């Protein structure tokens, strides 16, 4: 299988795909140089790249789910139940219980239900190199196609434009021969004219990377080029600064880690659900911290006004309440200690999650949907049903890890060791 790889994880991913028998194509000059490869200008079967959020990796094309699951054992992987570029028939503005926008009776899936809804366009015939539909006879190009290639592609599509077909050339088109391009357009126009969209559609995966797997990618990248710990996490905020530090003989992430929380304020805590949805929790002031070459630990004070209850603790939120939360890059949990205005402990809530990451004035972790609470000396594991429901996305390793950590925390709380 031929794979095109782009983004901040490209070096580590290239190493892993090569070691597992994949052929890397359309390499950037930098990647070709690092791996002593010739650039292969061949069409890709699958593209692997950063998501819109740099903490995600997406793949579009052939099915590589099993491979991705084998290397990212500690990250949720969402596999779209609906293929990208498939054509679906809807009922009451829904398909497979997902809302579709716009509300078309039939449409091409141009965005899978990553956020709970499917985005459609009018039906199109889609192939490896192009997509075709009836229109005003125009040609469009992927943003990844340069002007030199676009002239050749335009010469191929103009005859089809004259017949009233719109053609959009995909990035793979620049790697195909003229004969291959003509053959695909002929096939696509025929399929479109017969409304035959049965065979089209591409797998879409989204990996929401945990800190654990980012550190794994750091280790893999270090086999190819000088790489310090937290490289990929830091790359989400910094670019040149990371490169400059790694250009030193003995690079250290300490300075960059410290600069992420320079004013000792955390604006928000990003609580990321297994499906990738982000819930922003109230931030606060850093009251204690330790930052080293290979770890960081923070204690944050979060203050509250009255109104509502503490989820999981079933206690009222009152004026003057505050939370002292501890976050440690070495731990798979965060400890929340809720106090009243007189500094009396109201309850303790331990959120089971992947180790927390530092972004610019923010904390991010991946919630594992199970927590442990202690109120009035009674300890309970809560939300086990949520963990079970998310097992397919979390995968076996992460699911078992969450159960193991939750039980361990429960035991420690019962023994007053936390």
Swiss-Prot record:
GN (gene name): fau-1
Gene3D superfamilies in UniProt: FomD-like (2.40.380.10)
InterPro entries (UniProt xref): DUF402, FomD-like_sf, Ntdp-like, RNA-bd_FAU-1
Keywords from the named record: Endonuclease, Hydrolase, Nuclease, RNA-binding, rRNA processing
SUPFAM superfamilies: FomD-like
The UniProt record lists the keyword Transferase: no
Family: Belongs to the FAU-1 family.
Pfam families attached to this UniProt entry: DUF402
Organism whose genome encodes this protein: Sulfolobus acidocaldarius (strain ATCC 33909 / DSM 639 / JCM 8929 / NBRC 15157 / NCIMB 11770)
GO molecular function: mRNA 3'-UTR AU-rich region binding; RNA endonuclease activity, producing 5'-phosphomonoesters
Enzyme class: hydrolase
Name this polypeptide is given: Probable ribonuclease FAU-1
GO biological process: rRNA processing
Purpose of the protein: Probable RNase involved in rRNA stability through maturation and/or degradation of precursor rRNAs. Binds to RNA in loop regions with AU-rich sequences.
Listed EC numbers: 3.1.26.-
Keyword Transmembrane in annotation: no
């Amino acid at each position: 299988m031929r794979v095109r790889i782009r983004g901040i994880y490209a070096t580590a991913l290239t190493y892993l795909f090569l070691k597992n028998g994949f052929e890397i194509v359309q390499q950037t000059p930098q990647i070709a140089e690092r791996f002593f490869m010739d650039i292969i200008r061949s069409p890709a079967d699958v593209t692997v790249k950063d998501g819109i959020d740099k903490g995600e990796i997406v793949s579009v094309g052939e099915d590589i789910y099993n491979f991705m699951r084998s290397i990212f054992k500690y990250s949720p992987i969402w596999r779209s139940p609906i293929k990208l570029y498939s054509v679906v028939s809807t009922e009451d503005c829904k398909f497979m219980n997902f809302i579709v926008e716009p509300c078309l009776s039939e449409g091409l899936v141009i965005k899978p239900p990553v956020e709970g809804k499917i985005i459609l366009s009018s039906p199109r015939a889609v192939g490896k190199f192009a997509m075709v539909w009836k229109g005003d006879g125009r040609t469009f190009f992927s943003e990844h196609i340069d002007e030199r290639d676009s002239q050749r592609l335009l010469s191929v599509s103009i005859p089809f434009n004259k017949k009233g077909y719109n053609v959009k050339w995909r990035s793979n088109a620049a790697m195909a021969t003229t004969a291959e391009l003509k053959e695909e357009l002929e096939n696509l126009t025929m399929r479109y004219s017969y409304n035959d969209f049965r065979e089209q559609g591409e797998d879409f995966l989204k990996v929401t990377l945990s800190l654990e797997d980012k550190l794994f990618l750091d280790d893999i990248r270090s086999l190819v080029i000088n790489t310090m710990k937290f490289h990929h996490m830091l790359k989400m905020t910094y670019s040149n600064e990371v490169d400059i530090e790694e250009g030193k003989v003995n690079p250290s992430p300490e300075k960059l880690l410290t600069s992420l929380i320079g004013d000792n304020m955390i604006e928000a805590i990003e609580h990321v659900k297994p499906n990738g949805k982000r819930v922003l929790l109230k931030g606060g002031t850093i009251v204690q911290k330790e930052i080293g070459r290979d770890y960081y630990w923070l204690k944050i004070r979060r203050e509250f006004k009255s109104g509502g209850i503490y989820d999981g603790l079933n206690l009222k939120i009152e004026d003057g309440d505050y939370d002292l939360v501890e976050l440690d890059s070495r731990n798979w949990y965060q400890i929340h200690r809720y106090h009243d205005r007189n500094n009396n402990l109201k309850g303790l809530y331990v959120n089971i999650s992947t180790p927390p990451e530092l972004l610019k004035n923010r904390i991010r972790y991946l919630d594992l949907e199970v927590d442990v609470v202690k109120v009035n000396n009674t300890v309970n594991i809560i939300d086990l049903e949520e963990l079970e429901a998310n097992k397919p996305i979390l995968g076996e390793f992460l699911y078992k890890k969450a159960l193991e950590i939750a039980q361990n925390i429960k035991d420690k709380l019962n023994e007053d060791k936390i």
